Amino acid sequence: MAIAIAVESGVDPIDIAGSAPKLSGAAGRLEEVNVGQTFNAFVDYAHTPDAVSNVLSAVREFTAGRVIAVLGCGGDRDSSKRPLMGSALINGADIAIFTSDNPRSEDAQVILQQMVGSQEISDPARVIEDRKSAIEYAVSIAKPGDTIAVLGKGHEVGQEISGEKHPFDDRVVLAQAIAGAK
């Protein structure tokens, strides 16, 4: 749409094409984290069952290896979607890692139990409450050609636990975990 408007406004299509490589997407929306690793790594804000399914389906298109996904559900939000989110994670990822994501005033363990529901979690899938540890685990098992997708927080730079906001940025934590694993 923006390209059509630009052309209609008299911008030369060659100028538009030359600018395309400089464009970037929205922060935290399928945002690549690349520190020279041999696997793909992305952070996305996906926080609905459809969004989780769509992101995992999209990354599968270009993944030669396994899709490793890390996901949590926010506390004090619609608890009825938690089992649906868990199902989208299990169905869309080769390796599903359930974790916390802004539990707010709720017990993170209860949220995780609701996400997992009656689904069977078997190795190498995991339930790891601490989000940083969950991301580090994903990095530790990634192989060349795999894709890690860290979902749920996207551009957010905090983790709310028991009414307190703690600094936390999936992009930074993922980059640090990758750099530390080299």
What label would you give each PLM region?
Residues 1-182:
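ATP-dependent carboxylate-amine ligase
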